[in-house]
Amino acid sequence: QSAPARAAEPDVPEGWTISKVVVLASSGVRAPTHFEEQLQSMELGRTWKEWGVGAGELTQRGAGLIQAMWMPLGIELRKLGMFPASGCPDPADVYVRSDTLQRTSALLDGIAPECRLGYRVSGEEKDPLFHALREGWCPITSAASAAAQVIASLPQGSLDGLTESLGPSFDLLNGLLRPVNKEMCERYSFPNCHVDEMPSSVTVSPTGNRVVITGGLGMASGFSELFIMEYSQGPEDW
């Protein structure tokens, strides 16, 4: 059994001390928010995972993984003298800001188990930290022009070129999905289609606060994220 991964030793100049640590983290293993319904509707002859929680909610395994990820940081902070060697840190020394309570609780259980540390959960409010683009706090300037420049830099200068360059990945995805269900194919006038056969496009909202890739690339991205979540969640007996 391999030893658990450790954080790199900080490079602190002689005579200096670390006064603050800021960590930015994304979500853990959660139930899907997109493409789950489409996946379940496909007649693929296989049973897909039952998550046992609502869309976007952290699973039990996801909570355990978050705790395991943050526990080494708590140990490292004690070694650095930022947390006491034993017992709980001062609540004034730790602050967590999150968009969901579930991930916040799992994080705190990992970094300082059984300690009552401060946090803030934004919930449904418009929080510029988590949804700056969507809520218009940070609109994209010349979004259409920027999207065109990105597309021009792709293989063959097009989304079709990008799809072609990802051929092996699409072959793997097509093997999992087989032909996509008829309703999806009919949107693109195909009687029986695979994901990579659907034309892709980039759409920019008039307000410049949303850029969406639709078609084959968009679907492939969504399904791939879903499969990553399923793989991370593991078998039912984990």
Predicted regions and their residues:
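Long, internal stretches of domain cores in catalytic or enzyme-like folds
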Residues: 1-238
